Amino acid sequence: MSFLNVFSSRPTPKQVAKDRLKVILIHDRGELSDEVLDKIRLEILDVLSKYVEIENEDVDITVTKSNPIEGESPSLVANIPIKNIKGKAR
């Protein structure tokens, strides 16, 4: 059965928990408060809404650690699905 799991596209609960813990630790180390992250999220959505239609509920913005040559640094990662591009001729 474990052989078939190699081809599964769904992450295991263990992997999901591990990823969530990483995000929490990185968030803490990045020294960004929840208020700051919320402000960043709202400003990003405000700017993007001028150009594209998005579902606010589907937006995922997190702080992660990148791994550049000189060491790790926090990175802001945004997953924002676009429904439609405004002003696009149909």
From Swiss-Prot:
InterPro entries membership: MinE, MinE_sf
SUPFAM superfamilies for this protein: Cell division protein MinE topological specificity domain
GO BP, one annotated term: regulation of division septum assembly
Gene3D superfamilies, per database record: Cell division topological specificity factor MinE (3.30.1070.10)
Alphabetic keyword roster: Cell cycle, Cell division
Transmembrane intervals: none
Function: Prevents the cell division inhibition by proteins MinC and MinD at internal division sites while permitting inhibition at polar sites. This ensures cell division at the proper site by restricting the formation of a division septum at the midpoint of the long axis of the cell.
Family membership noted in the UniProt record: Belongs to the MinE family.
Full protein name: Cell division topological specificity factor
Species per Swiss-Prot/TrEMBL record: Clostridium perfringens (strain 13 / Type A)
